[in-house]
A protein has these predicted regions:
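Alpha-helical scaffolding within the catalytic cores
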Residues: 94, 137-141, 270-277
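C-terminal accessory segments enriched in acidic
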Residues: 39-49, 183-432
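Surface-exposed patches in mature extracellular/periplasmic domains of secreted proteins
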Residues: 71-77, 137-145, 217-218, 261-265
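Short beta-strand-to-loop junctions in surface cap/lid or active-site-entrance loops
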Residues: 87-100, 112
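Secretory targeting signatures
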Residues: 1-38, 344, 427-459
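Extracytoplasmic low-complexity repetitive segments enriched in small/polar residues
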Residues: 48-51, 79-82, 96, 109, ...
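Active-site/substrate-binding loop(s) of hydrolase catalytic cores
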Residues: 100-113, 118-242, 250, 289-291
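Short glycine- and acidic-rich boundary segments immediately preceding or forming the N-terminal edge
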Residues: 37-86
Length: 459
């Protein structure tokens, strides 16, 4: 495995030795005072001492108490030792919808699968801190994001392992090999007795399925090497949504960071049963493993943590700020009906492709009357399609929608979105097309009914 070391104020080796010295000194500080100082003296403690479960609990509870308008603290489940898996739900909760009345985007982040990978946990913490403190400071970027987006952040999944500084959970299981996606099919150690044998991974997957099933971004944070990994870990082949991942890679490299961004199998090694591949292969999310640093097993940092992870936080801000684009976004520009065909012009504003879009026509009660054949449209592209409409019958009050998956991966969520009635044009004359009755036909029908009624009266 290639280790990538960035240039900075301290080399990797020097930084590790300095951290060892710092950690030795800090271990002389009693645990309880350090915990209370975590909040009261952020410049001294927060910037150099990695979180324990206790100090994290103090911090997230303080945030929820101080900023109830944007922070909701909930529990996804418990560790094997019964510790709470805290999740911060961060958004402008004064409004449940975006300003335009549509549903908010959803982002899911977790850290701390491996208890000895503290900088991954700290990046999850810093991400939450950026949006909470930015809101308090009136940062316009943060205000805009929280008005349109929900952030769900589980900062420390392996709290038991974190506090004894070990990769495994208390049962000696590697939590990031314990998910139900090709579990135990790669060379690995300690994947557990079965998929989801551990309470931590079961709780994390349950949260994905019940609370953030419509997420358009999932980032899981680790350390070990400086790299971002997208699916797959099991296979070297590119994932179905390679266009999306390659766009993000190229955009990050052009504008933010030179961090390597690769398929996990090629960029690291074969790895199965991971939360990343579960998030993509089962949930259909765009997913990244964010390996923030090569450091492991240290409890503190000489360099300020916010400086050390500043570049990585910039990448997270980019991913979150642009989450609207991490799916297909189809807009029907026009529909023309006639001659047994429906001609449609469809634009994809998103950075992901979709391969199975179709037009739907419903009556006023929402009952499906007609469905087109499926068609695909690539990311940031547009298409003109002619669809067989010989069995289409128009009715008064009928409406149109477009139905499609948000990404190419089979697990991706389906959406059904309304088509603006102003873009629909009925040219008439097509076989099987029955427009609403004209006024002349209505008048004739009433006249015939009156004559028939009169004839019955005088019989």
């Amino acid at each position: 495995m290639t280790t990538i070391v960035r240039d900075g104020p301290l080399s990797g080796a020097m930084r590790r030795w300095a951290a060892i010295i710092l950690t030795s000194l800090m271990l002389t500080v009693p645990v309880a005072p350090a915990a209370s100082a975590q909040i009261g003296q952020p410049d001294i403690i927060q910037e150099h001492w990695y979180h324990s479960y206790l100090t994290l609990t103090l911090d997230v509870q303080a945030w929820a108490s101080d900023y109830p308008e944007i922070v909701v603290l909930t529990v996804a489940g418990e560790t094997e030792l019964g510790r709470n898996l805290w999740v911060l739900k961060i958004s402008d909760w004064a409004q449940n919808l975006k300003p335009d009345g549509t549903e908010k985007e959803v982002v899911y982040i977790d850290g701390g699968h491996h208890g000895n990978e503290h900088l991954g946990t700290e990046l999850a913490f810093l991400t939450a801190e950026f949006y909470i403190e930015g809101w308090a400071a009136g940062d316009q970027e943060v205000i805009d994001v929280l008005s349109t987006t929900e952030l769900h952040i589980l900062i420390m999944l392996n709290a038991d392992g974190n506090d004894i500084d070990t990769r495994w959970n208390i049962n000696q299981v590697d939590l990031n090999r314990n998910y139900d996606h090709y579990w135990n099919t790669c060379p690995t150690t300690q994947p557990g007795s079965s998929a989801f044998s551990e309470s931590e991974t079961e709780a994390n997957a349950n949260y994905m399925n019940t609370m953030v099933s419509d997420a358009d971004l999932y980032v899981t944070m680790h350390t070990g090497v400086w790299i971002m990994l997208y699916p797959w870990g099991k296979w070297p082949q590119q994932p179905s949504d390679w266009e999306l991942f390659h766009f993000i890679r190229d955009d990050v490299h052009a504008n933010i960071s030179d961090i390597p961004i690769r398929n996990a199998n090629q960029g690291l090694y074969p790895n199965c049963g991971t939360s990343r591949d579960y998030g993509y292969g089962v949930m259909g999310f765009p997913t990244f493993t964010f390996e923030t640093d090569d450091e492991q097993f240290l409890l503190g940092s000489v360099e300020a943590i916010s400086d050390r992870l500043g570049e990585e936080l910039d990448v997270m801000r980019y991913l979150i700020q642009n989450v609207w684009y991490w799916r297909a976004r189809l807009v029907v520009e026009s529909i023309e009906i006639g001659d047994g065909l429906v001609d449609a012009h469809v634009v994809n504003l998103g950075r992901a492709s979709t391969s199975n879009a179709s037009l739907h026509y419903m009556d006023s009660s929402g009952e499906l009357l007609w469905q087109s054949s499926m068609f695909g449209i690539n990311a940031t592209n547009e298409t003109e399609v002619s669809l067989d409409a010989r069995n289409l019958t128009l009715v008064e009050g009928g409406t149109w929608s477009i139905n499609y998956q948000k990404r190419v991966i089979d697990a991706s969520m389906w959406v059904n979105e309304s088509v603006d009635e102003n873009v629909i044009r009925n040219k008439g004359g097509g076989s099987g097309l029955l427009p609403a009755p004209s006024m002349l036909l209505v008048f004739v029908a009433f006249a015939l009914a009156a004559i028939n009624s009169r004839n019955r009266k005088f019989k």
